[in-house]
Amino acid sequence: MTKADLLSLALDDFLTISSEVEAAAVVSADGLPMASALPPNVEEDRLAAMSAALLTLGERAASELGKGDLAQVFIEGPRGHVILMAAGPDSVLVAVTARGAKVGLVLFEMRRIAERVTAIMTAAVGESRGLAAVDDHGDPPAPEPAATSVASWQ
């Protein structure tokens, strides 16, 4: 599977698990769409560009106000929320929710999907260096069991 396929699969899983999420996308920090699951009335390029601009402003505000690294950008409107969360060093997970969404649950699932996106993006870089790739679900390979010596059992 390609990186784009794995990202799309992660977004599809996110929308399936989080029924209150109406749209989701992974965009580059430069504002380019990488994968999306959007309704017809949402333009992928426009969402990606706006998300990158919001992320840049959020990072700058957090830094200049001495609040550390940006964790997420949260926008609330009368009809729902737009939430942006870093997903690796150069990509952003975007979720658009319905009004009344259980934001805590959405954020919980976003963290899980952001970790998966990070693994996919890291594996894409690692593959070019001869490192292990992600599995067909976009998850990193399971770690090898630690070897134990007889002496450690005594």
Segments from the language model and where they lie:
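Acidic, low-complexity cytosolic segments
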Residues: 1-21, 30-154
